[in-house]
């Protein structure tokens, strides 16, 4: 059941927050159909683009089923909705419980960190892929707080400063987009303004600046790099003609398609709102129940990993986080 609407939360803000979560889930599911493939392989199989959420992919999922990316995001979202605050200790426990559920996929950096062996050199995208709930919860909070929480969350698994800084910038950008309703160009200028006052890793700064005029040239050879995902998301923010086309174009680039599209989808959804979501994507996500015993389900998962209550989670996070 949806959370009662807070009278101070404008309908447009609620729409953009829901768009952010739905965008995360849709990009993840769409990208999972062709994960690890090259863009040439994808174009040969989908000459018109990957456009429908469907059963299949390398992990044999049902339409709308989250991968590790969004299962972890849902774990964070459930904590925020329940506690009404970000707690690194509780979130870390949730991630550990998730790992103990035997997920069908898990990044090496995440697995090692949750098992007590963090990799200080990894610049993988596993923290950025799950951070969108902090953008939703933080839409009514101070930017400095959102950035601090996002850095803490990254540090649970990804200790390299590039990962922490990318998390901070992206979560704050999502929160700003949801609250203010800015265009992609306006958001980009806002982001550059923040960066002028921050000490950032040179590679991160370069990726953000490059996004103004080009998408990542190669999503395959450095598959899983956080700056590929970030640069692509920002490029789509600036250049994609619509939410749908930005997500589809991301998937068509190949490589770590589910993660890149989850990240881009969260940002595009935060800009365009839930109304921009194709109806088929929305229906697949909100009716996805990968339960044991269903003959259609080849990869069953615990109920807390299902996306069926995604909109209720968004409403609860907004309610708990809103401080106008």
Which residue ranges define each predicted feature?
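Structured, active/binding-site neighborhoods that engage oxygen-rich ligands
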Residues: 1-324
């Amino acid at each position: 059941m949806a959370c009662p609407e807070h009278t101070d939360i404008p309908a447009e803000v609620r729409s953009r927050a829901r768009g952010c979560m739905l965008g995360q889930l849709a990009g993840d599911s769409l990208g999972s159909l062709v994960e690890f493939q090259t863009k040439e392989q994808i174009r040969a199989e989908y000459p018109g683009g990957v456009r429908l959420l469907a059963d299949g992919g390398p992990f044999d999922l049902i339409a709308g089923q989250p991968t590790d990316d969004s299962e972890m995001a849902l774990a964070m979202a459930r904590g925020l909705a329940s506690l009404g605050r970000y707690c690194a200790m509780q979130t870390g426990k949730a991630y550990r419980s998730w790992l103990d559920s035997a997920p069908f996929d898990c990044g090496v950096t995440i697995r090692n960190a949750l098992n007590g062996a963090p990799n200080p050199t990894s610049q993988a995208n596993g923290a950025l892929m799950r951070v969108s709930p902090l953008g939703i919860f933080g839409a009514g909070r101070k930017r400095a707080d959102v950035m601090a929480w996002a850095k803490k969350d990254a540090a649970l698994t990804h200790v390299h400063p590039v990962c922490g800084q990318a998390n901070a910038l992206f979560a704050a950008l999502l929160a700003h987009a949801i609250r203010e309703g800015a265009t992609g160009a306006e958001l980009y200028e806002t982001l550059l303004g923040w960066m002028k006052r921050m000490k950032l890793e040179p590679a991160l700064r370069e990726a953000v600046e490059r996004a103004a005029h080009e998408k990542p040239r190669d999503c395959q050879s450095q598959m899983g790099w956080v700056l590929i995902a970030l640069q692509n998301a920002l490029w789509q923010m600036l250049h994609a003609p619509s939410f749908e086309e930005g997500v589809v174009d991301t998937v068509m680039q190949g490589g770590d398609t589910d993660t890149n599209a989850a990240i881009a989808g969260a940002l595009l959804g935060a800009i365009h709102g839930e109304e921009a979501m194709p109806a088929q994507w929305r229906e697949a996500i909100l009716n996805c129940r990968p339960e044991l015993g269903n003959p259609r389900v080849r990869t069953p998962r615990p109920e807390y990993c299902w996306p069926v209550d995604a909109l209720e989670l968004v409403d609860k996070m907004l309610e708990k986080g809103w401080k106008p």
